Swiss-Prot record:
Pfam families: His_Phos_2 (PF00328). Its EC number is 3.1.3.10. GO terms for molecular function: glucose-1-phosphatase activity. It catalyses: alpha-D-glucose 1-phosphate + H2O = D-glucose + phosphate. Keywords: Hydrolase, Periplasm, Signal. It comes from the Bacteria. InterPro entries: Acid_Pase_AS, His_Pase_clade-2, His_PPase_superfam, Histidine_acid_phosphatase. Substrate binds at R41, R45, R118, E220. The keyword NADP does not apply. It is found in: Periplasm. It comes from Providencia rettgeri. This is Glucose-1-phosphatase. The gene is agp. One of its GO terms (cellular component) is outer membrane-bounded periplasmic space. PANTHER family: ACID PHOSPHATASE-RELATED, GLUCOSE-1-PHOSPHATASE.
Length: 417
């Protein structure tokens, strides 16, 4: 990655309200990377739902997996080792940490994950790739299998008013989507017309069924109906592809064009976004992780916390945080998921050593669908994909930088309930 220098464009306006300030870049040599916070989705896991309803909506047998439901797979571990290796090369290139074998003190790095097997293991494999042979502490709650409150995207507002507004927001979001083609494609792949559900419950066409949204305090936003079934089915099919199952076992050999993959994943993306990205929901469920990031990265002086902070959670954490912070729409090339397996939001704090001004750059770093399937080695020469992101209230220059002060204001606004 190439980074160019930022110089601050001061606003000409001398009166309130002051608009966010546009940064500008000229000289890369003056830019210093001071601190990085990564919010990562865990890497490749087995399907969370691979029995029950999925066996009832098709007359076919789903492929077997060699690990427990929801666990990181061996390939997922290897993929994260490669991601860690790439990040270490990037860290060394930008001189973020000391030039030594194990820059792994608490002042250098801090790894913190949700307390599930797939998130803890992701951090362990990342550390093995980034800091091989080094002692690296992985911080998490002691009870493995129980969600850490920081990463738990549950509703914390139990008021009837909130529930009413949240349900309406989910309904409005779903109404704005066009999912008919995706449902029809999935009906064909599953051969749902010959399934047990069709014979016993007349569920022969997913698009003809209604969804019912669920908002309850201390629980994740939920939905019952075809969207939930579709999400579970498409998730299982995506994971088969990433894991490297033989082509005739991936969706029984029926998803063989980019157009078909795109259609199916409109359903999975719709599930994630309908449940977790309506603003009223996003700001509520993302508040714990936003607060953690604010106190450990955004609202502290440089040097008070580790230079490289690595958090491992879930797609719901990333989706809700991005909505709460008002990220602009983005596209991830060569991926069908909007929050892909192993994908990472990389928050970078840079300083212009001439002006002494600080800047923020945010990138989505992720493995393409084929990099995941091929278990592709990653390095500076063969990197993962990078997409520079932009926040609505933190305008970026041509090289993707926005002012640190505006970024702090974005975080403060996101934390407002």
């Amino acid at each position: 990655m190439k980074y160019k220098v930022l110089t601050l464009c001061l606003s000409a306006a001398l009166f309130a309200p002051i608009a966010p300030t546009m940064a500008s870049t000229d000289n890369q040599a003056d830019m210093v990377l001071d601190q990085v916070l990564v919010l990562s989705r865990h890497n490749l896991r087995t399907p969370i739902v691979n029995t029950g309803i999925l066996t009832e909506v098709t007359d076919k047998k789903w492929p077997d997996w060699d690990a427990k439901s929801g666990y990181l797979t061996t390939q997922g571990g290897a993929l994260e080792v490669y991601m860690g290796h790439y990040f270490r090369e990037w860290i060394d290139q930008n001189k973020l940490l000391a030039d030594e074998l194990c820059p792994t003190s608490n002042e250098d790095i801090y790894l913190y994950t949700n307390s599930l097997q797939r998130t803890i293991a992701t951090a362990q494999f990342f550390a093995a790739g980034a800091f091989p042979g080094c002692k690296v502490n992985i911080h998490h709650q002691p009870e493995i299998g129980k969600m850490d409150p920081v990463f738990n995207p549950i509703i914390t507002n139990g008021s009837p008013e909130f529930k009413q507004k949240a349900l309406a927001a989910m309904d409005d979001y779903l109404k704005g989507l066009s999912l008919k083609a995706g449902y029809e494609e999935l009906d064909t792949v599953l051969n749902i017309k010959d399934s047990q559900k069709c014979k016993t419950d007349k569920l022969c066409n997913l698009d003809s069924q209604k969804n019912s949204f669920i908002i309850e305090a201390d629980k994740e936003p939920g939905v019952s109906g075809p969207l939930k079934i579709a999400n579970s089915a498409v998730d299982a099919i995506d994971l088969q592809y990433y894991e490297g199952f033989p082509a005739d076992q991936v969706a029984w050999g029926l998803v063989d064009t980019p157009e078909k993959w795109k259609k199916l994943n409109t359903l999975k993306n719709a599930y994630q976004e309908t449940l977790f990205t309506p603003k009223i929901i996003a700001k509520n469920v993302a508040h714990p992780i936003l607060n953690y990031i604010d106190k450990g990265f955004v609202s502290v002086d440089k040097g008070e916390t580790a230079k490289f902070i690595f958090l491992v959670g879930h797609d719901s954490n990333i989706a809700s945080l991005m909505s709460a912070m008002d990220f602009k729409p983005y596209q991830l090339a060569q991926q069908y998921e909007h929050t892909p397996i192993g994908g990472k939001l990389v928050f970078q704090r840079w300083t212009d050593k001439q002006t002494k001004k600080d800047f923020m750059k945010v990138e989505y770093v992720y493995q393409t669908a084929d990099q995941l399937r091929d278990n592709a080695y990653l390095s500076l020469e063969t990197p993962p994909k990078h997409v520079t992101l932009e926040l609505k209230d933190c305008p970026v220059d041509k090289n993707g930088y926005c002012s640190w002060e505006d970024f702090q204001k974005v975080m403060a606004k996101a934390l407002e309930q």
